[in-house]
């Protein structure tokens, strides 16, 4: 009987622990920087949202007036993010960043460079 009570308590703690692990959403909004061959990037406004759920990372980004795009990856060593995202015309953007308490950041590099610190969204 004692064994059943202990197992029940442990199972309850696992359920509570799992329920407390909520995804964390980070965001950045800013303007681009020119890369070789571009000249209009400082006029392009970008919104980037990154959701971290354990080691799973899902991002979405949208340049003002353009369709929303996305990427998925897993956190690397020391919270590193590194992947690529397909944008219009089949072109690619490199996605590089870091999720680290007090020092989270993101960079999209391709037709322009969009880079900045990620801040936690309210409620995350």
Question: Residue locations for each model-derived region?
Answer:
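Bacterial N-terminal signal peptides that target proteins for export
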Residues: 1-9
């Amino acid at each position: 009987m004692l064994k059943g009570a202990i197992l029940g308590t442990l199972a309850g703690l696992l359920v509570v622990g799992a329920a407390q692990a909520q995804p964390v959403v980070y965001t950045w909004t800013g303007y681009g920087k020119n890369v070789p061959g571009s000249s209009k990037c400082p006029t392009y406004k970008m919104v980037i949202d990154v959701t971290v759920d354990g080691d799973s990372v899902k991002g979405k980004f949208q340049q003002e007036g353009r369709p929303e795009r996305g990427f998925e990856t897993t956190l690397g060593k020391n919270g590193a993010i590194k992947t690529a995202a397909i944008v219009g015309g089949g072109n690619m953007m490199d996605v590089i960043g870091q999720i680290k308490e007090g020092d989270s950041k993101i960079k999209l590099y391709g037709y322009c460079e969009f880079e900045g610190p990620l801040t936690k969204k309210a409620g995350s």
